[in-house]
């Protein structure tokens, strides 16, 4: 064993980072469209409903037939890249601001999501996407939901013939809205989301353009080090 006294370790110094970061590149962003105005004739539309609330209404009414699903959103600045990501729920057609768009493969995020290039169809202001579907459910679905003496096994194996889903837009844009602090720490509540130009400097990621972001994003900042010892 050595009798040498171990060298005293120097206390580590804390390097404080600033609050503002610069955005590197143009990461593809997302906005979720989960409220729907629906119509059975393509002319008269109901007030906006959350997609799950609409689904429950249709199940209770046992509706069957063509169904127009209108997703509305606002655009402050037109993005160069914008794709609609939507599931095939017995889809007949998809229009953006009255113009038909065609499928352009599936999303790398999830193969069940079809991709539609909609950038050239957007306009500044209120935009609308209308997805026309053939809505129906089999009697097996209604029996499992509302029948008597239904086993848990049948309920657990239930598969709907037609779903009512939210859709999303993915592209080179920022997403902005009205934000407020939630009841718990680090919880933020947002509403009235809209598409705008991506900010180049960011202090708070969620409130400054990325409330729905999923994926990798690179931020940078300059740090001044006065003492390197």
Question: Residues of each region from the PLM?
Answer:
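Solvent-exposed beta-strand/loop surfaces of large extracellular or lumenal domains
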Residues: 89, 94-116
């Amino acid at each position: 064993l050595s009798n040498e006294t171990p060298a005293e370790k120097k206390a580590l110094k804390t390097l404080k980072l600033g609050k503002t970061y610069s955005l590197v590149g143009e990461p593809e962003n997302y906005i979720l469209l989960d409220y729907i105005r629906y119509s059975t004739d393509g002319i008269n539309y109901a007030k906006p409903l959350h997609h799950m609330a609409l689904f429950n209404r249709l199940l209770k009414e046992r509706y069957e037939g063509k169904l127009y699903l209108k997703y509305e959103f606002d655009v402050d600045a037109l993005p160069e890249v914008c794709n609609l990501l939507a599931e095939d729920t017995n889809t007949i057609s998809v229009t953006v601001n009255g113009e038909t768009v065609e499928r352009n493969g599936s999303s790398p995020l999830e193969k069940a999501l079809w991709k539609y290039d909609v950038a050239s169809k957007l306009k500044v202001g209120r935009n609308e996407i209308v997805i026309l579907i053939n809505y129906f459910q089999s009697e097996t679905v209604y029996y499992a939901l509302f029948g008597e003496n239904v086993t848990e096994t049948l309920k657990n194996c239930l598969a709907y013939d037609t779903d009512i889903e939210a859709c999303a837009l993915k592209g080179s844009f920022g997403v902005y809205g009205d934000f407020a602090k939630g009841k718990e720490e680090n919880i933020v509540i947002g509403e009235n989301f809209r598409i705008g130009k991506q900010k180049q400097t960011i202090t708070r990621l969620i409130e400054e353009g990325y409330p729905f972001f999923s994926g990798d994003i690179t931020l940078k900042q300059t740090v001044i080090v006065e003492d390197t010892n």
